[in-house]
Each structure stands twice: as structure tokens, then as C-alpha cells.
Amino acid sequence: MRGLIIRNTGSWYTVRTDGGQLFDCKVKGNFRLRGIRSTNPVAVGDWVEILPTTGELPPGGALPTALITEICDRRNYIIRRASNLSKQSHIIAANIDLACLVVTIAHPETSTTFIDRFLASAEAYRVPVLLIFNKVDLYDADEQRYLDGMMYLYRTLGYECLAVSAVTHQGMDALRVALAGKISLFSGNSGVGKSTLLNLLVPEARAKTAELSLAHDQGQHTTTFSELFDLPPLPSALQVPSSSPDSSSSPGTSDVQPPAAQSPISPGAIIDTPGIRGFGTFDFEREEVSHYFRELFQIGRECRFGNCTHTNEPGCAVKKALDNHEIAESRYLSYLSMLDDKDEGKYREKY
């Protein structure tokens, strides 16, 4: 029996079958031993084969139970290094059409290093990205100028950006259109307003929200597990004629099309994930890190040496472009930080 993982609460997974039936599932014991280097062998968004059982029930469980016996082929996924196990990865979500990163310029500030690490991981696993700049109603003139500069930088690199406010609803219609018909990952630091945005997009989600810490201007973890929520139909006033896949593709978009049986859930869905304070990249070889920074990869073709790391080598086109202000210093510093990953704590500045 085949189904979609729509919720992950640790060792238990909620699976929705093709027929709409829900099961509380665990991964079959010997399935865990197949050389999987992840803290979670399956993730929300995975299509799996399940075998109904009559055994152990999860705490407070009222659903029938089953064992997950097989993962169907993934068309993509996005991972980060497990926060406490540097040699293992954590699969954030699988089979997604769009990776949305909710960021804030202040209250709290999302570091450019965090943003760039997320973008690099999405590039590596061929997942299109939408940067959602939230809380625009709170910014003063200086912060607004910084926001404009950030959006200009990332749009110039080919990334789609939206400025939104969960309070005034600015940009929410544009966000609804961007998410329509797609399975979208929602990720971001704690405190950026991800849960509030989710409640506006999917009122039935009833995601918990919390006040920022007055001492640190950081958020508390209000989402403790990953869950998929179906989006409501797009209002008719926002519907536009669909374009062909070729005309709507963007840089970084995977050319791997989903199998018919794994097509996006109409009219779309959001995979909500717990807030994270750091984004450790996983399984990147040192010499390939620059491949996931679009501008560094393009300019790096002009370097004297094919294996240039853009640090101290002579004839480095990237260093020359940096000196000429042709690439952003923040992006280059993010690149350097990924070359020298040591601990998760440095990925986000302390307040």
C-alpha cells in the first residue's frame, strides 16, 4: 500500500494513502540498517510503501498502524548537517517543488551566512528557492534600505524574492500565487514569523506562535516537528492562466519532472518545519562548494587554475571580481565559511 508521509513526530510518521486513509507508521527495523547516513531515513514529502500491522501504538494514537517497508524514488530532497551529529545528515523534506526561506532583516536578524548556506544546499539538490522577507511593517528607514539592497542582490543572482507582512498582509496575495499548485518547504530561523504566515495561508493549521525573547530578540521553537498542510484553493481573483513548464523555469530549477503518480497535491501544500538556528551543509567536497554559488561558479571559469579555491591562488578571477566590487563581499564571506565548517554555533551570530 502506497502513501505520502505528511507528519513526522520523531520515531512515528503519519502516512496518507492514495485512498486518503491515515496510518501511524514506524520504519521497519531492518530498513534502518541499509547504510543510511541520516538521522531520519524518511521525511515529510516522501512517498512510501507501508504494511498495516496490529502492534505498538504511538502515545495517544487513535489511527491504525503500519510499517514503512520501502521509500519510493525521490525526485529531490534538501538536507542539512544534523545539529548534534556532524557526520550525519538530517533530511528536511523530500519531493518538493519550492524551498521557501522566511527571513527577517531585524527582530530577529537572519544572517546572510544562513541565507547563503540554505541557497547553496538548494542549488546542490536542484530545488528552486523563494526568499520571503517578512515583518516589513516593522522596519525603520535604514532597515528598509538594507532590505532593498538584500532583495536587489538576490534577485540579481536569479532568486525570486517577496517582501511580506503577516500583520498588514502586504505581499500575501503574491505569496499565495507563488505557492499555488506546488509542494513547498517552509524553513527559517526561530522568530521570523513562519508560523504566523502559515496560519494566514492555511487557517486550519493553527500553528503555535510565540513572542520574541526581549533579552535576545530571538524566537522560541513553536514548531517541534515537520508536517504537511494542504493549501486552500487559490481565490479566483488571483488565478492566472498556467504557463508551460519551459516558460516558467528559473535558474536552479530541476529539469527532473515528477512521475505522474507523484504530481503536486492540487492546489498545493506546505511542509512546515521547526525553526533552526544554524544550517550546516553536508557532503560538500571543498573543491565543489563554489559550484553552488551562482556568481562564483560563473566567474570562476576564468581562473588560471581549474581547481582554484578562490582563496590564495594566483590568477583567481573571483578574487579579482571581489576587489572590483563585482561580487558581494557577504556572499564571498559565506563561501569562505563553508570551506571551513567546524561547528554549528558560528552559522548565526549571537545577540
Residue ranges and their predicted role:
Residues 1-9:
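Structural detector for short beta-strands of small beta-barrel domains
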Residues 22-38:
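Beta-strand/loop nucleic-acid-binding surfaces
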Residues 88-98, 102-157:
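Phosphate-binding glycine-rich loops and their immediate beta-loop-alpha structural context
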Residues 139-190:
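Canonical P-loop GTPase G-domain recognition
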